[in-house]
Swiss-Prot record:
It is found in: Membrane. The keyword Lipid metabolism does not apply. Pathway: Secondary metabolite biosynthesis; terpenoid biosynthesis. Its main location: membrane. This is Dimethylnonatriene synthase. InterPro entries: Cyt_P450, Cyt_P450_CS, Cyt_P450_E_grp-I, Cyt_P450_sf. One of its GO terms (biological process) is response to herbivore. It comes from Zea mays. The gene is CYP92C5. Its cofactor is heme. Induction: Strongly induced in response to herbivory-mediated wounding. Heme binds at residue 464.
């Protein structure tokens, strides 16, 4: 009894000390913040700030949009220990991503970035500096240049045919198929063939390949804007109370095993080619990166960044994870919207019949003439951006934005979801699926970062470098699915019954997978074609 009483007193004393410390910290923080002219926003609680508002029933992007509706398009809130500024309108995004891009284009330290990208050696999480500039240049001139993307056009066409064959096989029984499962398999093979080569593209169906795919799914599900509280409250990060770091390390070890095998295989193939006296020709992005890595070791200037072996792995991981997830998720959302809006499906089908005809599949050369398909893709990206909150930016220095202070060290979030549904930018039914809004003069509204009302790939220095490849994958995917099959919902399921709930991780997938019946509508021999 005496021991229990002593423990109770000790716990009460510890709680009192904690409350006093929080009060002291909050008071000191309040005095410092009075010297700043911060954007309007909610006050928040000690220690956690406004993190609680993002942990409720609403997904973070929707919760932040609701707060911005009360406090304004440029909003300040404290998330844990950090000042956070949120841009929720096209004008606010323009200020963050263009006007003040130089000061706000850095990245904050994150456990996911440090662990899974080999100590910030990729492109997504890497802070600004010589290495990031080198990686960005490689993406623009080597990995995702127009010439490189064009060189893999046949690969993309072959995987579209493989997707059609798989769906054709399911059509015989008139059974509903899980759309994302089929599309994700095709995009995985597509990206693997481009990134790591033909030999490794079949690993999707192997036990090791399946484990790799599951680990990617787990990483995407676990890595969201506020999924790891330790990112926002540093002492909780040190304790790893959610086990987030342990999970990331486990996934990293699995991925590293996979990438190391790929690199060793490529190096051996290159060695054999050189030993036989033949000229080695790069056939995939690993070949390109290994060659660039070797060349970077010969640089004489100490100021120039090198591309280490782990950097090759980190860049390949960014390509595989980003390319697979974003394309598959967007195609599934597009098909869900078309199934919920039969009139839009009919318009897309009519356009394909007119432009392509019934004697062949859609080729990438057809895409510039498929204006309605382009509008469907843009409208899908507007309503369902894969990353509704762009990857967080970081203020490297104190900056004044629209007359408000953004303190050095602040996190800066761009709510692409809120911007894309802002009545100020989209006055005509902003929550409705209307591809027609992107036809005519509005067709000039693009997704490549120049139009701040539509930012699925970001803008400025941190724009996604693979946006052109992503658009080709999604547009060709949607076009071929609609062209090759007449789609309908399963018996007993009405359009209004199709759930549009979101599951938020690093990407925003459908919470309920889309099931639909695909009935072939082209000549039978086309479904057995490989080219």
């Amino acid at each position: 009894m005496e021991l229990a009483s002593t423990m109770s007193v000790a716990m009460a004393l510890a709680a009192a000390i904690f409350v006093v410390l929080c009060s002291v910290v909050a008071s000191a923080r309040g005095r410092r913040e009075k010297a700043l002219k911060l954007p309007p926003g909610p006050r928040g609680w000690p220690v956690l700030g406004s993190l609680g508002a993002l942990a409720g029933a609403l997904p973070p992007h929707r919760a932040l949009a609701a707060l911005a509706a009360r406090h304004g398009p440029l909003m300040h809130l404290r998330l844990g220990s950090y000042h956070t500024v949120v841009a929720s309108s096209a004008d606010a995004a323009r200020l963050v991503l263009r006007t003040h891009d130089s000061a706000l284009a850095d990245r904050p330290d994150t456990a996911a970035g440090e662990i899974t990208s080999y100590g910030y050696l990729g492109i997504v999480h890497t802070p600004r500096g010589a290495y990031w500039r080198m990686a960005r240049r490689l993406c623009a001139t080597e990995l995702f240049s127009a010439r490189r993307v064009e060189s893999f056009q046949d690969v993309r066409a072959q995987e579209m045919r493989a997707l059609a064959r798989g769906l054709f096989g399911c059509a015989a029984g008139r059974r509903a198929v899980a759309v994302r499962e089929h599309v994700a398999g095709a995009t995985m093979r597509n990206i693997l063939r481009m990134a790591v080569g033909e030999k490794w593209s079949g690993c999707y169906g192997s036990p090791e390949g399946e484990a790799f795919r599951r680990s990617l799914d787990e990483a995407f599900a676990a890595t969201g804007a506020v999924s790891n509280v330790g990112e926002w409250v540093p002492w909780l990060g040190w304790l790893d109370v959610q086990g987030f770091k342990r999970k990331m390390k486990r996934l990293h070890d699995l991925h590293d095993h996979f990438y190391e095998k790929i690199l060793v295989d490529h190096e051996e193939r290159r060695r054999l080619a050189q030993a036989s006296g033949g000229e080695f020709v790069a056939t995939d992005l690993v070949d390109v990166l290994l060659q660039l890595s070797e060349e970077s070791t010969k640089l004489e200037s100490e100021s120039e960044a090198r591309l280490p072996r782990d950097g090759v792995k980190a860049l390949i991981q960014d390509i595989i994870a980003g390319g697979t997830e974003s394309s598959a998720v967007t195609i599934e959302w597009a098909m869900a919207e078309l199934l919920r809006h039969p009139e839009a499906m009919a318009k897309a089908t009519d356009e394909l019949d007119r432009v392509v005809g019934s004697g062949r599949w859609v080729a990438e050369r057809d895409l510039p003439e498929l204006h309605y398909i382009d509008a469907v893709v843009k409208e899908t990206l507007r309503l369902h951006p894969v990353g509704p909150l762009l990857v967080p930016h970081y203020a490297r220095e104190r900056t004044v934005v629209a007359g408000y202070d953004v303190p050095a060290g602040a996190r800066v979030l761009v709510n692409a979801w809120a911007i894309a549904r802002d009545p100020a930018s989209w006055p005509d039914a902003p929550d409705a699926f209307q591809p027609e809004r992107f036809l005519g003069a509005a067709a000039a509204v693009d997704v490549r970062g120049a139009h701040f009302e539509l930012l699925p790939f970001g803008s400025g220095r941190r724009i996604c470098p693979a946006y052109d490849l992503a658009m080709k994958l999604v547009a060709a995917g949607v076009a071929n699915l609609v062209h090759g099959f007449a789609w309908r919902l399963p018996d007993g399921v009405a359009a209004e019954d199709v759930s549009m709930e979101e599951h938020v991780g690093l990407s925003t997938r459908r919470k309920v997978p889309l099931f639909a019946v695909a009935e072939p509508r082209l000549p039978v021999h086309l479904y057995s074609a490989t080219e």
